């Protein structure tokens, strides 16, 4: 299982259910990388999707303890149930939000992290993989600048 997330310099990922600074290059990378895959997403993150619509060209699994019905999403009540539902799928990505990342990180072996080199007001953070002994930065796929903000798309793998 893999995950994909954009983080700021302090590993912040969001504020009040949204990304304070969203780069179009990161969104393009997200779409390209997750297309045709299964995505596991939390209820609050789905609430930030336009019209709460499922992501196109992906199997969408909603991870929620609540009995939530959202058209286009399959419901899993636990990380283990989400894993069982996606067993056999070629690629499975955890796409947030903060609670889902924390629950699913121990089950992931690879992480695509877009490091956005700035800070923004955040109330949600991703664990700093540079400080975790069981994760290693293996590759930088892309570096760039957008609207005066530099970024790096990095790959981390579990040791």
Protein language model features and the residues they cover:
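Enzymes that bind and transform nitrogen-containing heteroaromatic metabolites
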Residues: 1-159
């Amino acid at each position: 299982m893999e995950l994909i997330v954009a983080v700021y310099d302090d590993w912040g990922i969001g504020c009040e259910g949204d990304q304070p600074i969203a780069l179009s290059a990161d969104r393009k990378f997200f779409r390209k990388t997750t297309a045709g895959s299964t995505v596991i997403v939390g209820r609050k993150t789905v609430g930030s999707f336009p019209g709460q619509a499922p992501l196109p060209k992906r199997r969408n699994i909603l991870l929620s303890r609540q009995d939530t019905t959202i058209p286009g999403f399959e419901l899993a009540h636990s990380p283990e149930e989400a894993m069982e539902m996606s067993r056999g799928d070629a690629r499975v990505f955890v796409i947030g939000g903060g609670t889902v990342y924390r629950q699913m990180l121990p089950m992931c072996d690879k992480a695509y992290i877009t490091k956005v080199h700035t800070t923004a007001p955040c109330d949600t953070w991703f664990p700093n993989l540079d400080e975790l002994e069981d994760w290693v930065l293996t590759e930088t796929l892309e570096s760039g600048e957008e609207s005066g903000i530099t970024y790096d798309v990095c790959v981390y793998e579990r040791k």
